[in-house]
Amino acid sequence: MAVITEENSNNLFCTDSLELTSNKQDDQVISNYLKPVRSYPYIKYSRSSLLLTASTTLPENFVISFTNSIESEESDKSDYLLDHAHSLQELSTTHSSLSSTLTSMSEESSSTESKFATLNDGINGGNPYSRLYRKNPSSDPNDIPPQFHFKKKSKSFYSSMYDKMKIRINILPNGNDNFIKKRNSGFALAPIACYNHTSDLRKLLKHKVTGSNASIFKRINPRSRKRVVNPECSVTDTPYGKLNNVIGEGASSFIRVINDRNKLPIYVAKVFRPPLDTSLLRRYVRYFIAEYTFASTLRHPNIIKVLDIIYKRHTILQIIEYVPYDLFTFITKGHCSALKADQMFFQLLDGVAYMHSLGIAHRDIKLDNIMLDENLNVKIIDFGTAFVFHYPFESTTLMSDGVVGSKPYVAPEVLTQKPYDPSAVDVWSCAIVYCCIALKRFPWKVPHTSDKRFNLYVTQRNDPNTKSQLIESLPMNSRDTIYHMLDIDFNTRCSISGARSTTWMQQVRKTLI
């Protein structure tokens, strides 16, 4: 007789397999005894074997018993079965002790959870994510998870990117780029280009141009030839409204107004011209998405609000708040008083100082990129050439390289083909903007010794016994600030925050409150 009995055990966990074998004459006897339990899923019974598989759970008071005459030659098998039966009994004892241990642990866990819930409800209003129960963050940078490790770009990366920007592309549809080649000496460096703003010079400089330069000014007249807009890339409808008249255009985009139901302008759409070379489309998309990322992140009263970016019919559009005036037209028509000029200059410095506090340099501060709202407040636009020169929690300043910006406004170090501080370039450009507002003209065409006016400024500045004609022509209260902002050496040039904190600017600030 072979008996496998397990009584008074709760859910025995069998970690071994037990096989009961019999000869043919014993099949009927075994079958009769196992009929009641043959339906159990953890018992596998065949013609000549009964198998209790591993990792099965046996019910309480489970008994398997069968009797039959076992031949002497089967005695070894009987001993084998009895050994397994004893093993199962030992496992049952072990399981019982583990079960009691788990039960006690479960009770302790439930009591701990109830205590935590009571404490949490009483102290923090039932918030399990309270700061009271958070662990203090580690101050060791090595404990930061790897997914939050960021590396700043190397200088070689920016150099290679700048070389790639020199690839020649056709900006106008149908390959009609002759007009741009004549107007913009920085053509084919798009989308980042050094813009030769001789059209601005033609408006501001009052003297008559003669000789070979006369034909150049005739060709660069922006009204002399209209741009052709590719109808396949034009978009007439957006979620913000329908696009209407074109109110402005540049080398790589044009501006269309969006009116409300009363036909009053509420937004403008900056529509970018895609390159005809499809291989450059990826760079085109990446460039303008980067511009949108800069603009949409900035939140300041003197910086334009960029609301959305839309990709439709292979054309990228930026939805921007509508501002009715531009600073260039405002000053050329003679509407700018001395006090208003100082106020607008303070607002310009305030907006640029905000950008610099975030480690961002504009790199293309000029009259065309400064708009005015209904109350004549300054709005800085166009962040296509913005550059991150400082990262949080770092003391180093990333240097920029390459000719970026508009020639009358750029600092002299930009033309030296050496790395330079982009924030110092913004300081220089802001000072040039003030000179244009106050004098109604540019101080020079390009900050290079080949330009007579700039060469005169450098000569007079280096001579301690001579006063600069440019500085002396400015209003008295602004001379000292502009003098330090137009320092030839960008290492000793004053910062935007320094210019903003001068006595002159603080007095102007009081008039705006």
UniProtKB/Swiss-Prot annotation:
The active site is at residue 364. Its EC number is 2.7.11.1. Residues 98-120 are annotated as: Disordered. Residues 241-505 form the Protein kinase domain. InterPro entries: Kinase-like_dom_sf (IPR011009), Prot_kinase_dom (IPR000719), Protein_kinase_ATP_BS (IPR017441), Ser/Thr_kinase_AS (IPR008271). Keywords: ATP-binding, Cytoplasm, Kinase, Nucleotide-binding, Nucleus, Serine/threonine-protein kinase, Transferase. The keyword Nucleus applies. ATP binds at residues 247-255, 270. It holds the Pfam family Pkinase. Residues 98-114 have a biased composition (Low complexity). Its main location: cytoplasm. It is an enzyme of class 2 (transferase). Transmembrane segments: none annotated. GO terms for molecular function: ATP binding; protein serine kinase activity; protein serine/threonine kinase activity. It comes from the Eukaryota. It is found in: Cytoplasm; Nucleus. Gene3D superfamilies: Transferase(Phosphotransferase) domain 1. It catalyses: L-seryl-[protein] + ATP = O-phospho-L-seryl-[protein] + ADP + H(+); L-threonyl-[protein] + ATP = O-phospho-L-threonyl-[protein] + ADP + H(+). GO terms for cellular component: cytosol; nucleus. Belongs to the protein kinase superfamily. Ser/Thr protein kinase family. This is Serine/threonine-protein kinase ppk8. It comes from Schizosaccharomyces pombe (strain 972 / ATCC 24843) (Fission yeast).
